């Protein structure tokens, strides 16, 4: 990662080895804190696994009509975001590897343009992930507290419009990040967006779980009460809690890195923390790998559809193993 005073979004999201590509010196960094090098194979493996898993998730949602609900549409949006961030990191790693080993010769200016595209993809992904998680949280809130009117409030058409708005907003953010990549205010904007959405989601969760128990008791007295639906709604809320928890754990070091990059780039301790940037990229990719596992763990319908898709492509030994679960 580049720790130069030129605070570009590019510098914040490249691997440590990019300094050799651009021929820039790493300043303000303690000699005791060297950049952590991670094998290219690790990035490629995580990128490939994430790609396959999230394609499986999207395929399951498309294939199974029982998964054609607003919550799973938002899950599909989250899967696309996960796939995007993993693939952008993997592609960037391949590009850096090829240039470092002189397999391809590209002008520094063109390399920077390519990296701007990769960085934009990461920005689009994190904003899309946050927006999709927020949409799922709102969907679960409506399911629990407005159960009898849920299908009138959250229709498939409305969920489609919401997803379209999410990705239009995210792509617009990506374009802005490319245009103003030299400004540190772009980074401040991204950090502010992260904590603002995090605040809304956590507040919604606290409110949701504090009131859920009393609401369940009250609605249970209604003759139209559906206990199965209510349990499914709470299960969906717990699944979302797991997704949000993993998202915070995996993305927080990255955003802390951005904060330190702006606030204390010359501090030795900040420099030491920033020297592990490659590890923070790995954590982000791990988030993309873990999310589909959570879907499979929490949804029997999703597991069954995964099995059908895998078996449909002739992996009979894998199907035999899956059949045990």
Curated annotation (Swiss-Prot):
The keyword Nucleus does not apply. SUPFAM superfamilies: Family A G protein-coupled receptor-like. It is a multi-pass membrane protein. Pfam families: 7tm_1 (PF00001). Residues 62-73, 139-155, 212-239, 298-325 are cytoplasmic. Gene3D superfamilies: Rhodopsin 7-helix transmembrane proteins. Keywords: Cell membrane, G-protein coupled receptor, Glycoprotein, Lipoprotein, Membrane, Palmitate, Receptor, Transducer, Transmembrane, Transmembrane helix. Very low expression levels is detected in brain, while high levels are found in adrenals, stomach, lung and spleen. PANTHER family: G-PROTEIN COUPLED RECEPTOR (PTHR22750). Receptor for MSH (alpha, beta and gamma) and ACTH. The activity of this receptor is mediated by G proteins which activate adenylate cyclase. This receptor is a possible mediator of the immunomodulation properties of melanocortins. This is Melanocortin receptor 5. The gene is Mc5r.
């Amino acid at each position: 990662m580049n720790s130069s005073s030129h605070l570009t979004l590019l510098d914040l999201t490249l691997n440590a080895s990019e300094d050799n590509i651009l021929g820039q010196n790493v300043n303000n960094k303690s000699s005791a804190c060297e950049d952590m090098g991670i094998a290219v194979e690790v990035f490629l493996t995580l990128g490939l696994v994430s790609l396959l898993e999230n394609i499986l998730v999207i395929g399951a949602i498309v294939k199974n009509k029982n998964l054609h609900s607003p919550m799973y549409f938002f899950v599909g949006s989250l899967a696309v975001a996960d796939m995007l961030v993993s693939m952008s990191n993997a592609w960037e790693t391949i590009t850096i590897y090829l240039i470092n080993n002189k397999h391809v010769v590209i002008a520094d200016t063109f390399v920077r343009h390519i990296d701007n595209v990769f960085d934009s993809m990461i920005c689009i992904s994190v904003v899309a992930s946050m927006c999709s998680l927020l949409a799922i949280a709102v969907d679960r809130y409506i399911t629990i507290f407005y159960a009898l009117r849920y299908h009138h409030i959250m229709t498939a058409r409305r969920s489609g419009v919401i997803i379209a708005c999410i990705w239009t907003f995210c792509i617009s953010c990506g374009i802005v990040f490319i245009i103003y990549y030299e400004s540190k205010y772009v980074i401040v904007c991204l950090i502010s967006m992260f904590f603002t959405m995090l605040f809304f989601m956590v507040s919604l969760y606290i409110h949701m779980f504090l009131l859920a128990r009393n609401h369940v008791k009250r609605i249970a007295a209604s003759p139209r009460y559906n206990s199965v639906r209510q349990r499914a709604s709470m299960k969906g809320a717990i699944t979302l809690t797991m997704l949000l928890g993993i998202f915070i754990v995996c993305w927080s070091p990255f955003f802390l890195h951005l904060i330190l990059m702006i606030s204390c780039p010359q501090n030795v301790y900040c420099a030491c923390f920033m020297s592990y940037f490659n590890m923070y990229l790995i954590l982000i990719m791990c988030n993309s790998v873990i999310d589909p596992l959570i879907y499979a763990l929490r949804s029997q319908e999703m597991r069954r559809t995964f099995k059908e898709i895998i078996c449909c492509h002739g992996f009979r030994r894998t199907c035999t193993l899956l059949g045990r679960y």
